[in-house]
Amino acid sequence: MTEINWKDNLRIAWFGNFLTGASISLVVPFMPIFVENLGVGSQQVAFYAGLAISVSAISAALFSPIWGILADKYGRKPMMIRAGLAMTITMGGLAFVPNIYWLIFLRLLNGVFAGFVPNATALIASQVPKEKSGSALGTLSTGVVAGTLTGPFIGGFIAELFGIRTVFLLVGSFLFLAAILTICFIKEDFQPVAKEKAIPTKELFTSVKYPYLLLNLFLTSFVIQFSAQSIGPILALYVRDLGQTENLLFVSGLIVSSMGFSSMMSAGVMGKLGDKVGNHRLLVVAQFYSVIIYLLCANASSPLQLGLYRFLFGLGTGALIPGVNALLSKMTPKAGISRVFAFNQVFFYLGGVVGPMAGSAVAGQFGYHAVFYATSLCVAFSCLFNLIQFRTLLKVKEI
């Protein structure tokens, strides 16, 4: 058996996640302009731009369980390579699309073959000692956050100098680099389970520690992503409503970035704290903290105040998705960890699809402040449900 240094894998996986996060954030901000450049009429630009973004998430949600099954059968490293190389084509190929239909088709395929980040997460979760899983997965999550923050700056610079299509070529090169780094440096001593000893998916969900918590954690991932994405479509408009008329996009970008930076700062610390006090305990506290911050955001009186609240919000996010991942890692047999992470990713993707639509609908009916109130209510229900589900386990550190 090959000796694996999980810390070396963590470093490479972190950089791969950084490149993937940067690639995603490089594409999304320019989608409406690119759709317009493809000849779509002004009245349909918003629809097709939204479709190009959401179709990728929907197809990813549908195919994620399939890749999870294959990862448990053949290994997580092959799935990381598969995702990196396939997305090199589907994302880099956007530079050559002649019309909107090819754009939608490639975005659909991108979702079908996506999965670098969840497979990297499953790989590290399968190798790291259980008592350090919170810290390791928290650190790993900062790679995506750092990439997401860096991407728009790089993309804006490249787009201004060379055009939007060049940005897509850059994205393709990022993803190709992530695949090459995985091939060369990620180590996995995967031992395929004999077919007669393999755990069927139905049995896997009942063989995990505390099976009744599994769906609850999936729903928590949905709520976390739903609440985060429901704010996205209205944030710039809310900032303008608070009195910001000059440099609106710049100020809105700063507010978004402030949360990302604080999240990146806190994720590793929160992961270590979760390992020390219990990830389930910290998850409930972090959700309660989120409810308070959402309520404060709803009552912000200036863009500066909103930015401060969003920065404070980011400090708690390091205990949310990384906390869920750590709990899933500790509860699940290693032979089925990729499938469990894949199903969790389905709920995460669905939250990303439903959240923006729900946020826009609430804003249209009740105003921008109402989006934060509604979001805080959703998170409060999830927090209360988790508190009830964890009630017998709050006395112990590990579950």
From Swiss-Prot:
Top-level lineage group: Bacteria
UniProt entry tagged with the keyword rRNA-binding: no
Principal cellular location given in the protein's record: membrane
UniProt keyword Membrane present: yes
A GO cellular-component term linked to this record: plasma membrane
Cross-referenced Pfam families: MFS_1, Sugar_tr
GO molecular function terms listed in the Swiss-Prot or TrEMBL record: transmembrane transporter activity
Compartments in which it is found: Cell membrane
Transmembrane segments: 12-34, 49-71, 84-106, 140-162, 167-186, 217-239, 248-270, 306-328, 340-362, 366-388
Membrane disposition: Multi-pass membrane protein
Cystine crosslinks: none
Keywords for the protein's UniProt record, in alphabetical order: Cell membrane, Membrane, Transmembrane, Transmembrane helix, Transport
Gene3D superfamilies in the record: MFS general substrate transporter like domains
UniProt cross-references to SUPFAM superfamilies, sorted A to Z: MFS general substrate transporter
Family of the protein in this entry: Belongs to the major facilitator superfamily. TCR/Tet family.
Function: Efflux pump for various substrates.
Annotated protein name in UniProt: Multi-drug resistance efflux pump PmrA
Organism: Streptococcus pneumoniae serotype 4 (strain ATCC BAA-334 / TIGR4)
